[in-house]
Amino acid sequence: MLLPTVRSRIAALSSRVASRAAYSTTVPRFTENAMQPNDPTPRPAKPNVSETDATPVDSMGAWDAALQESTDAAERVRTMQAPNRKGTWASNQKPRAEAMSGPRFEQTIMHLQPTPMAAIELIHKQPVRWVKDKIVSCDGGGGPLGHPRIFINTDKPEIVPCGYCGLPFAHEHHREYLKSLPTSSYPLEPTGAAEEVNENQRVTEGATGYEQR
C-alpha cells in the first residue's frame, strides 16, 4: 500500500528539482549592442523646438526680460554637446540632441539650461611635463578635485597623457626627437596661455614626484 505513495512523492519531488535546475541566475544576459546597425536610408533629424518659444512670455520675476528664443538658436543649443564642441568626445557619452528631446523640451528656453564647457580642448593647451624618471605618478593635484594616483610609463618616445586628467608627460631623453616631429598634440614648451597650470602648483600637501605640475 505504501509503494504507490512513495513513487508519487518521488515523481513530484523530481519534477520540482528539474524545474528549479532549468533556471539559473548565472546565465549571461545579452548586453546592449554599442555598435548600431547601418541604416542605408537614415531619417532626417526633426527639430524638437516649438515655435511658441519665439513668443515673449513673462518670466514672473525670475528674469528682468521676457522669456523668448528663436527656433534656430534653440535648436543649435540643443544639438551642441557643449558650447565649444559640437559632437561627443568620449565613448560613454550620449549625444545631447538625443537626451534633450521629446515633449518635455519642446517649450524650454535652451540658452537658460546648464551647458558646461568641454575641457577636452583646454587640456590640450597644457605644456608637456618633461621628466627624468621612466615611471611617474599623477593624482590630478589631490584633494577633492584630484583623482586616484596612477603611474605612467614614459620610456617610449611619445607624449603620454594621464588617463584621468589628461596632463601630458614625456621623458627628457626624447625631447629632441619629439621636437623634430612636424606636429604635436600638446605644446612642448609653455606658451603663456591663460589656461596653463603652473608646474610648481601643489595641491597635495607634502607631495613628491609629479602629482600636479
From Swiss-Prot:
Signal peptide: none annotated. GO terms for cellular component: mitochondrion; respiratory chain complex I. Residues 28-56, 182-213 are annotated as: Disordered. Transmembrane segments: none annotated. InterPro entries: Znf_CHCC. GO terms for biological process: mitochondrial electron transport, NADH to ubiquinone. It holds the Pfam family zf-CHCC. Residues 28-38 have a biased composition (Polar residues). Migration on a 2D-gel is shifted by co-cultivation with L.plantarum. This is Lactobacillus shifted protein.
